[in-house]
């Protein structure tokens, strides 16, 4: 029985790490949706800080999900969080031409790897 309890505990802890949040922001002439997939951020910090942006003048909605939904035009994989030892995958939705400035930011500032879903 202790083995079964250990397996259940292991599965539960793996589910804790499989977390993401979809952040949708809207303002005049602005409609942005990203999904942040947690890689190494402590759970409480991820929920209280990373998924709760303070964007004055914008309508912000946050939805917690197990994994980021499909349909992103680009993903900044293993993005480094400024001044912290944490990593996350950032999925971008919406206007694919935004990749022109998101990709350089991802690779140069966030030290991540730019991925295009569906391409290998």
Predicted features, each with a name:
Residues 19-120:
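Extracellular/cell-surface secretome signature
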Residues 1-4:
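Bacterial N-terminal signal peptides that target proteins for export
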């Amino acid at each position: 029985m202790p083995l079964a309890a250990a397996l259940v505990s292991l599965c539960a802890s793996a589910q804790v790490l499989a977390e993401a949040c979809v952040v949708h922001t809207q303002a005049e002439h602005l409609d942005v949706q990203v999904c942040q997939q947690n890689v190494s951020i402590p759970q409480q910090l991820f929920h209280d800080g990373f998924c709760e942006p303070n964007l004055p003048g914008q309508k912000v909605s946050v939805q917690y999900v197990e994994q980021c939904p499909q349909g992103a035009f680009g993903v900044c994989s293993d993005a480094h969080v400024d001044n912290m030892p944490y990593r996350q995958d950032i999925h971008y939705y919406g206007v694919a031409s935004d990749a022109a400035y998101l990709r350089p930011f991802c690779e140069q500032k966030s030290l991540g790897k730019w991925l295009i879903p569906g391409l290998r």
